[in-house]
Amino acid sequence: MPPSGPQGTLLLLPLLLLLLLRAVLAVPLERGAPNKEETPATESPDTGLYYHRYLQEVIDVLETDGHFREKLQAANAEDIKSGKLSRELDFVSHHVRTKLDELKRQEVSRLRMLLKAKMDAEQDPNVQVDHLNLLKQFEHLDPQNQHTFEARDLELLIQTATRDLAQYDAAHHEEFKRYEMLKEHERRRYLESLGEEQRKEAERRLEEQQRRHREHPKVNVPGSQAQLKEVWEELDGLDPNRFNPKTFFILHDINSDGVLDEQELEALFTKELEKVYDPKNEEDDMREMEEERLRMREHVMKNVDTNQDRLVTLGEFLASTQRKEFGDTGEGWETVEMHPAYTEEELRRFEEELAAREAELNAKAQRLSQETEALGRSQGRLEAQKRELQQAVLHMEQRKQQQQQQQQQGHKAPAAHPEGQLKFHPDTDDVPVPAPAGDQKEVDTSEKKLLERLPEVEVPQHL
């Protein structure tokens, strides 16, 4: 019986979802067994799901309940996916349910923040919101109950994550396909932009890079005897003539949980990938290397993972070594460049999509340019009106000053007496002297015109 301990408290869940629980199936509980020295817990790999943290926390809480852990041991993949296991949540201890309730309230709070962000974005027409993706954020929770964690929540969490992870690899393949099509599209556009001689030289250089990339040692089929023996010899430093599948499995079950998960499997392919890809070489694309790693892992899972739970048990691994294909070397593994990720028709549609997107962006840029020019012209008119207003105000002030000077000069000059004698008038500075009729009329007219124009002029706030 495998040793018990903290690493034996997790259960395998189909389709990588509950990868964090995988050790429970491999390590049964031993009641009354003496406590053994605890080994440091290994960090669980990120599933890539947007609710990964919530999923991880729910698993950590559930595995502390002895009753649920025992039911988890006895459950098979179908029990988990169908929701049968979720009903056992009714029998977990009160403090476990309390912790689960708090986790759900925290997740609901997080989703409410997302909803608030969505509403804020809707109020701004310039913000593009993917409403469908936002709504998907809620699919792993029971919308009828926002406060307590029930069996329905566990069932939804399992079903949603199982479905999402089943689509995870497909999404990666699609992303790689678009990457390859964009790369080919840019290559063709680059060649079209060159003159005839330059284009021939560029094509020759590209062909040379492709030739160097194809020249590599034979790549063994992942999971084959040749591939595993190479790891056994070069990575483990053991005698290839004494290859033992069971020992190999134990050596590469890094966290000793009784299964090889996807990360542990992918680590076995490093030596094969190094034959083809070198980050120092211009001709080797590291994005292609990661796609190659994914293809290798899928190949092994398809042929070894008989129950399709995305984990390889010791029994499944040993059974695969008995198959005829295990020792068949053949011509080796066919790499990515031997299997184009897209067809010419797919590339044509992709380029049409790019052209439409480019046209849309150009139209938007043109509209923005026109709006900028219109704002510039409006600003110019505003500046002209401001200068005209300033000149009118200055002119009016000058006229008033002239009138005041004329009034002062006319008031203080002594009047001549008819007999030739000067006659001085008493001081009447306190009495207002009206301006000449003609001048006063002209000032009134100027002020009236100025006041009539004021509503038409929008003076900036900084004036």
UniProtKB/Swiss-Prot annotation:
It is a peripheral membrane protein. Residues 228-321 are annotated as: Binds to GNAI2 and GNAI3. SUPFAM superfamilies: EF-hand (SSF47473). Residues 172-218 bind DNA. Gene3D superfamilies: EF-hand. Ca(2+) 1 binds at D253, N255, D257, E264. GO terms for molecular function: calcium ion binding; DNA binding; G-protein alpha-subunit binding; guanyl-nucleotide exchange factor activity. The modification Phosphoserine is found at S86, S369. This is Nucleobindin-1. It comes from Pongo abelii.
